[in-house]
Design a protein with these regions (language model features):
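Short, mixed-charge low-complexity intrinsically disordered segments
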Residues: 43-95, 140-144, 148-193
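Short aromatic-glycine-(Arg/Gly/Cys) micro-motifs in beta-strand/loop hairpins
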Residues: 1-49, 66, 75, 94-141, ...
Length: 193
């Protein structure tokens, strides 16, 4: 797995339309159900995967008064892309070089997400949450695959069946705490100036 960046999201509870009773919340890499900060892209601090190389940048795009609504995630990406029935080496964008993972992050699962354009900004959809496939596959309470092997099997299936168009990427999702604390926000602001 390759360290790929950081992103803060407003994690949403499982919607009623997702019939996966063991799922409590949506922590997928997709922004479809659990979005990032409004207009985060306008800051243009992200890398070629649509994540941030620095924790301070991931936190810095969130308005100060709303930071308690967000949770901070780190992502590690599998070195292969799943396309149709084939696998190929991941073409990692040159600007993906995140700072070392700070202490306190823990793995909460794995996702398999689509990207329909090689030049696209970020990963787009997670069939587990976006297409309710969490009701058909083994997932944890975060709507993520519990193991890397399960996520790879999911990517193989999704790439072949195309519940969402595009190539599929496997990502480990790590969380740095239940919420972005004011002290982290203040430190992030100082670090980004």
């Amino acid at each position: 797995m390759i360290d790929a960046g950081y992103f803060a999201k407003r994690v949403q509870p499982r919607p009623d339309c997702l019939p996966a009773s063991g799922v409590l919340e949506i922590c997928s890499v997709s922004e479809c159900l659990s979005p990032g900060a409004d207009d985060w892209i306008a800051s243009w601090r992200h890398n070629g995967l649509g994540w941030f190389n620095r924790v301070s940048d991931a936190v810095g795009v969130i308005p100060e008064k709303r930071r308690d609504e967000y949770r901070l995630f780190a992502y590690r990406i599998h070195p292969e892309v799943f396309r149709g029935r084939e696998r190929s080496a991941l073409p990692l964008p040159d600007d993906v070089h995140p700072e070392p993972l700070p202490a306190g992050f823990r793995s909460i699962g794995f996702d398999s997400a689509s990207r329909s354009s090689v030049g696209g900004l970020s990963l787009e959809c997670s069939p587990l949450s976006c297409n309710a496939m969490a009701s058909e596959m083994p997932v944890n309470e975060h709507c993520l695959f519990p193991t890397l092997d399960a996520a790879i099997a999911g990517a193989v299936r999704f790439a072949a069946e195309q519940p969402e168009p595009g190539d599929y990427y496997v990502v480990e999702v790590l969380e740095g705490g239940p919420r972005i604390e004011p002290s982290l926000s203040a430190n992030a602001e100082r670090a980004s100036t």
